[in-house]
Amino acid sequence: MEGKYLYFASDDDTSPDGAGDSILYPVNSIAGMEPEASNSLKIYFKPRNTSSFVEDDHESVSITITGNKHKQVMDAIIAEINSGSRDGGFITVADVPNSIFLSSDIIGCTDIAVLT
């Protein structure tokens, strides 16, 4: 696979091995990001299932962040996407079970919502 991909693993389980526990998205599927609360950022993605006929259907991942650091976290994600490719284009944004985060302002991943 060519390109860059964003990886998320939630804190729902110590082993992200089921539906909704972890997900990998190509960066070109990002549809936007928005604050969800003072300590939460929602990242929207174009759906992986292309059989959806609703134009505004999106999948999303909610990450927990340091309070009011939305812009800094969005900057960090975009900077990593735009940087030279490392690790085969695999970008870990939030891997809660392994305590790996793209930025020190990212502290969790609470919701992975996919279309079925």
Task: Specify the residue positions occupied by each region the protein language model found.
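Eukaryotic intrinsically disordered, low-complexity regulatory linkers and tails enriched in Ser/Thr/Pro
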Residues: 1-116
